[in-house]
From Swiss-Prot:
Expression tissues: Present in both larval and adult muscles.
Species per Swiss-Prot/TrEMBL record: Drosophila melanogaster
Keywords: Calcium, Metal-binding, Muscle protein, Repeat
UniProt-annotated binding residues for Ca(2+) 1: 60, 62, 64, 66, 71
Gene name in the database record: TpnC73F
InterPro entries: CALM/Myosin/TropC-like, EF-hand-dom_pair, EF_Hand_1_Ca_BS, EF_hand_dom
Residue ranges of every copy of the EF-hand domain listed in the record: 11-46, 47-82, 87-122, 123-155
One term of GO molecular function: calcium ion binding
Record-linked PROSITE patterns: EF_HAND_1 (PS00018), EF_HAND_2 (PS50222)
GO cellular component, one term: centrosome
Protein name, UniProt field: Troponin C, isoform 3
Family under the similarity heading: Belongs to the troponin C family.
Binding positions for Ca(2+) 2 per the UniProt entry: 136, 138, 140, 142, 147
Amino acid sequence: MSSVDEDLTPEQIAVLQKAFNSFDHQKTGSIPTEMVADILRLMGQPFDKKILEELIEEVDEDKSGRLEFGEFVQLAAKFIVEEDAEAMQKELREAFRLYDKQGNGFIPTTCLKEILKELDDQLTEQELDIMIEEIDSDGSGTVDFDEFMEMMTGE
């Protein structure tokens, strides 16, 4: 399995397995590549037809016109993970905007401290101060969106 499947949760893999099995009518352990679009559609997963065709070509290494489950997961993961990352960035941007009351692209570290406290009420004052210190590396007393994203996603 490639590193991309490691980004999927066990729940997502279970959903993919169910979808795969329901399209593997002969129980051969593989599905025709033309069924992949139907499966993604049924899962409510948006995709670009051209990108999907390119990915199928890339993932169907033996060029059999059929995908084994591992190949299918590898392909589906590319759509699911990307969608999640985009959705997460959008949600974080919205959250940041709520706290950026002046709309100047910064939030005060005092405000960030409150956010962190809400996210994890087990954190001590000292732990919060250490986190703030790491995030606000320039000591400006404010955090911009990039610093906020980095803190929230660890990237």
